[in-house]
């Protein structure tokens, strides 16, 4: 039996919705935000057996051929709006992609603040060729028990397995926090000290490092689960 599988999952903490709905002068420990997707093909061999007149059990062994796996994590996200003189947003962002021929494409941009130079940011992707990006195995286990002519119960453990991927293309944010403390002691003219333009450029550059991802290349192989589930009926 040959099948193609694809799945998508996300994890959004309750605190994220609380922050979006009730933004106020307090601290929010939002936690971890996650989104991921995967696709693979499976070659399955199964067998079932009647143990007695009431109980039947079955198992399926599956050989997995990974096509692609993508994970995005925004870890330890915090928003501190409790202070009167500054607001802080922090978190570690990481994107991981396992797929044959996959690469991130980057562009070089200049920081707004004079003298800070340039930075690289991921702005596109490229897939040079295609094929199998990983291999793995999985098991399906199940049982059906007939209580009487009217009642039958069943249980199944599905997709208990893993895929070992040959590459992990990784990108992370350069800066793990953004702090806004307002505009203080600024002047319109440059010769009289800090200007509004200069102060705003500092915030823009800080936000740039926080939200943009930088390519870190191939971090090597990794092993991921395919999402085991338990069903009862």
PLM regions: where:
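N-terminal accessory alpha/beta regions
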Residues: 1-6
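Outer-membrane beta-barrel porins/channels
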Residues: 7, 11-233
């Amino acid at each position: 039996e040959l099948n193609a599988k694809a799945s998508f999952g996300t994890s959004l903490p309750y605190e994220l919705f609380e922050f979006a709905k009730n933004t106020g002068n307090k601290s929010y420990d939002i936690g971890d935000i996650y989104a991921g997707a995967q696709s693979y093909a499976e070659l399955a061999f199964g067998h079932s057996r009647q143990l007695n007149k009431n109980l039947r059990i079955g198992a399926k062994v599956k050989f997995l051929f990974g096509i692609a796996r993508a994970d995005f994590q925004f870890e330890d996200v915090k928003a501190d709006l409790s202070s009167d003189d500054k607001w802080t947003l922090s978190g570690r962002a990481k994107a991981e992609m396992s797929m044959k021929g996959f690469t991130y494409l980057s562009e070089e941009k200049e920081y707004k603040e004079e003298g800070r130079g340039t930075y690289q940011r991921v702005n596109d992707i490229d897939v040079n060729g295609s094929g199998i990006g990983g291999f793995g195995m999985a098991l399906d286990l199940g049982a059906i028990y007939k209580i009487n002519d009217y009642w039958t119960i069943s249980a199944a453990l599905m997709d208990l397995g893993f895929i070992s991927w040959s590459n992990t293309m990784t990108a992370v944010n350069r800066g793990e926090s953004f702090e806004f403390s307002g505009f203080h002691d600024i002047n319109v003219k440059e010769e009289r000290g800090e200007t509004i333009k200069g102060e705003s450029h500092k915030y823009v550059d800080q936000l740039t490092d926080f939200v943009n991802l930088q390519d870190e290349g191939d971090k090597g192989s990794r092993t991921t689960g395919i999402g085991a589930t338990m069903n009862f009926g």
